[in-house]
Amino acid sequence: DPEEIKANLFFRNIIFHPTVIFRKDLPSGDSVSYNENYLRAQDYELWARLVHLINFSNINEVLVKLRSHKNTVYRTDRKSQVKYGDKVKTKQIQRLGINASRENIRLHKKILNSNHSFSLESLNDAGVWLLNLLQYNNRREIYDKYYFRNLIQHYWFLICTSSTEYGMEVYKIFNGNESLSTRNLSLNYKLRFFLKC
């Protein structure tokens, strides 16, 4: 679904560059050119911009067989790639109408890299931030509300389950906000999360 792809691009680059195929009637000009200010994340910046102009879709076929080697940008200049990818994410936060502080951006990056453990205080801060993103999108309707909410809930679940060393307090925080807690979470996942606490 194009709206699901669009919502996902708010959080991370989900488009595998070598597999992109454009229709011939795509608008021309600067809107379909790489922005040189995003050196190692030019593709992500382009997709994040284009997704607001055209529909993206997936073809359910394997189009590329990837051979990974030690000289890929991902391996040789990962730091730069992350830095420019973060610039794209900041730009998308601004598109929602949020003038985010450095601390907000740092928290946003930490949430997206959800293998980090959160303190109880930063977990509460993350909940406030995610709720803020949800509310701004609900007002501006830039991303499909259903898909955007699902992704917000997904990240909320990930960061809560990565912080289970704080026991039942984390489970209470997770369930404490109905807008963030995932009602469609299977009983199996809820039980596993509960037992981890």
What is the predicted function of each stretch?
Residues S68-C197:
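C-terminal subregions of glycosyltransferases and related glycan-biosynthesis enzymes
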